[in-house]
């Protein structure tokens, strides 16, 4: 009687023991970011481009997901721990580009605009107003995280304003409608690789100039996702400035895999980490046919 086939699906490797992970080309890891990062080799990636989940916005029903912490300090503390491992994995001359969204306190009110496409994923109520803030305060999460990472040893080198010309309108009447987010540039060391010429932008009078700190980039929805994805044109200058062809680029919150797509376009290797199996499938489909490895990592 032939033996039953117990091998994992083609292209998928199941790793159950916490052994070191060796990078052999572009790879997508399904698992918790901190668990996977702790097993990656030190100094193995040249650049990190990522956008962590917002705090208290959506519940995807995934255990250990980022963004469901009870308090804002817990959320920030957890991200600082993750980026401490990111720093270890980064080369000494490497760079981190970090985008994270902000929000307003709400006094525990329900959301005004639920996720109509995926109502089960919308949080029923916003988190409680953080200690020290008032209802309707802008929480300042991007800068709180930036300063926390700076305190943890990162070099904060630049704050880029991501201006969204096609930003979704807000119904507010008591403040300006938001149309920007921040993209922070951090480095591991005082001296680092930065190819300013590769990241130049068009100058008003013609020619090219050193890229400025306000980037006008439209949001770009992806038909296969229920969320607005990281725009490729926000990612591309980061990769141009901080890597050379063949370098590894890490995104520990891989989502639908846009960082991976840009890496393929620019002849870079990507390392993606994503906890949500639905997103892993989505990203793998987008990267199909590009010799990407998908590895599932069991929880520690």
Swiss-Prot record:
Basic and acidic residues: bias regions: 112-127
InterPro entries, alphabetized: DNA_methylase_N4/N6 (IPR002941), MeTrfase_CN4_CS (IPR017985), RM_Methyltransferase (IPR001091), SAM-dependent_MTases_sf (IPR029063)
Cellular component, GO, one term: cytoplasm
Pfam families: N6_N4_Mtase
Start and end residues of each stretch annotated as Disordered: 109-129
EC number: 2.1.1.113
Keywords on record: DNA-binding, Methyltransferase, Restriction system, S-adenosyl-L-methionine, Transferase
Keyword DNA-binding: yes
GO molecular function: DNA binding; N-methyltransferase activity; site-specific DNA-methyltransferase (cytosine-N4-specific) activity
Catalytic activity: a 2'-deoxycytidine in DNA + S-adenosyl-L-methionine = an N(4)-methyl-2'-deoxycytidine in DNA + S-adenosyl-L-homocysteine + H(+)
A Gene Ontology BP annotation from the UniProt entry: DNA restriction-modification system
Top-level taxon of origin: Bacteria
Name of the top EC class for this enzyme: transferase
The family this protein is said to belong to: Belongs to the N(4)/N(6)-methyltransferase family. N(4) subfamily.
Entry protein name: Type II methyltransferase M.XycI
Organism: Xanthomonas campestris pv. cyanopsidis
Gene responsible for this protein: xcyIM
């Amino acid at each position: 009687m032939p033996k039953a086939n117990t091998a994992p699906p083609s292209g998928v490797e199941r790793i159950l023991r916490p052994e070191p992970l060796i990078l052999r080309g572009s790879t997508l890891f399904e698992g918790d970011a901190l668990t996977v990062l702790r097993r990656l080799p030190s100094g193995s990636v040249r650049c990190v481009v990522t956008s962590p989940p917002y705090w208290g916005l959506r519940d995807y029903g995934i255990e250990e997901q980022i963004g469901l912490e009870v308090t804002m300090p817990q959320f920030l503390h957890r991200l600082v721990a993750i980026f401490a491992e990111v720093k270890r994995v980064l080369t000494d001359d490497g760079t981190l580009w970090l985008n994270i969204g902000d929000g307003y306190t709400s006094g525990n009110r329900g959301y005004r605009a639920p996720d109509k496409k995926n109502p089960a994923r919308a949080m029923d109520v916003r988190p409680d107003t953080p200690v020290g803030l008032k209802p309707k305060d802008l929480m300042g999460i991007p800068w709180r995280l930036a300063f926390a990472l700076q305190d943890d040893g990162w070099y904060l080198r630049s704050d880029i304003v991501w201006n969204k010309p096609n930003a979704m309108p807000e119904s507010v009447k008591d403040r300006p409608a938001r149309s920007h987010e921040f993209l922070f540039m951090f480095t591991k060391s005082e001296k680092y690789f930065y190819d300013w010429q590769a990241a130049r932008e068009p100058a008003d009078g013609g020619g090219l100039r050193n890229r400025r700190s306000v980037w006008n980039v439209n949001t770009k929805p992806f038909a296969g996702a229920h969320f607005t994805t990281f725009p490729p044109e926000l990612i591309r200058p980061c990769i141009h400035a901080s890597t050379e062809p063949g370098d590894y680029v890490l995104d520990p919150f891989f989502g639908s895999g846009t960082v991976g797509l840009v890496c393929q376009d620019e002849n870079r290797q990507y390392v993606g980490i994503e906890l949500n199996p639905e997103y892993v499938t989505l990203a793998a489909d987008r990267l199909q046919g590009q010799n990407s490895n998908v590895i599932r990592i069991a929880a520690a």
